């Protein structure tokens, strides 16, 4: 009986090992693994020393673009993870694929069950829509100049991308009048779960206008009781993303992790010696 149990366990371990991926290079001095999952490109960068709880930050689009936050988190022991659903516009198919990918990361790689979601530009569509359906799996959200309303971007004027969106969502242009897939309209579950959001945006963004996207999210999220912070860059357009000094975003993300150890602030009381005590000590 013991031999049978041993063989079963060995088979399971061997099966898991077979799913592992060979190193394909390095990214900022750490091992990088590129592979496909459900026929889509994926990447994992493994820190030299993983932080407690195996935290990870997950991008659904634009790996290695303006990576100041990713680099800083990698140094602090985060796994940097990418799964390409860039051109799926936060569709139900994208959300379903993302959930399967998440389960693979937490089961096979033993990454934290609470993921930090990172959405740049159109990546915001996936981040918000996936979070709305998987609130228990999210530690926090970092979005940068995010698309939050498809009528703002790509919008009907961008004919090629608009038709691409319609095809992915299996909708007609007329059917979009009743579209229910915009992040700005699906914030209630995220706010109810109290998921913290931080966003970096340019106030002069002409591609994904702040007032039509993240500013709407900010006002509605606050009204729903959700915690949100926005860093607004004056005079900045859609690019460059992120911050030259990523510390405000990194600190925000670190504070939301399940294994984060809050600082204990201590006050050391000090009483100045009296002149008599001072004289006696001489």
Which residues fall in each region the model found?
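Glycine-rich nucleophile elbow surrounding the catalytic serine of serine-hydrolase chemistry
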Residues: 119-129
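Hydrolase active-site cap/lid region
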Residues: 129-174
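The feature captures the conserved acid-bearing segment of alpha/beta-hydrolase catalytic domains
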Residues: 166-213
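Conserved small/polar residues in nucleotide/adenosyl-binding loops
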Residues: 270-277
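Alpha/beta-hydrolase active-site loop
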Residues: 90-109
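C-terminal catalytic histidine-bearing segment of alpha/beta-hydrolase fold enzymes
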Residues: 212-218, 222-266
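Alpha/beta-hydrolase fold nucleophile elbow
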Residues: 110-121
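A domain-start/cap signature at the N-terminus of enzymes
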Residues: 20-52, 160-164, 261-264
């Amino acid at each position: 009986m013991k031999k049978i149990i041993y063989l079963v366990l060995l088979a399971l371990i061997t099966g898991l090992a077979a799913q592992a991926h060979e190193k394909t290079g390095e990214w900022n001095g750490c091992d990088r693994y590129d592979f496909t999952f459900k026929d889509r490109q994926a990447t994992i960068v493994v820190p030299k020393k993983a932080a407690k709880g195996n935290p990870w930050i997950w991008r659904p689009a634009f790996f290695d673009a303006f990576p100041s936050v990713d680099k800083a988190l990698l140094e602090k022991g985060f796994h940097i993870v990418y799964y390409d659903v860039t051109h799926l516009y936060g569709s139900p198919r994208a959300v379903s694929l993302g959930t399967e990918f998440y389960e693979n990361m937490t089961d096979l790689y033993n990454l934290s069950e609470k993921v930090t979601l990172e959405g740049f530009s159109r990546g915001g569509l996936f981040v918000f829509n996936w979070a709305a359906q998987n609130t228990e799996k999210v530690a926090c959200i970092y979005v940068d100049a995010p698309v939050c309303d498809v009528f703002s971007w790509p919008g009907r004027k961008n004919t090629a991308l608009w038709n691409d969106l319609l095809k992915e969502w299996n909708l007609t242009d007329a059917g979009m009048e009743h579209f229910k897939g915009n992040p700005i309209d699906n914030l209630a579950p995220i706010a109810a779960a109290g998921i913290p959001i931080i966003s970096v945006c340019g106030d002069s963004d002409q591609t994904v206008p702040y007032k039509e996207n993240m500013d709407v999210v900010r006002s509605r999220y606050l009204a729903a009781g959700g915690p949100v912070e926005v860093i607004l860059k004056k005079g900045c357009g859609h690019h460059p993303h992120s911050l030259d000094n990523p510390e405000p975003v990194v600190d925000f993300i670190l504070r939301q992790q399940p294994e984060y150890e809050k600082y204990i602030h201590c006050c050391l009381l000090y009483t100045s010696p009296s002149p008599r005590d001072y004289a006696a000590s001489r």
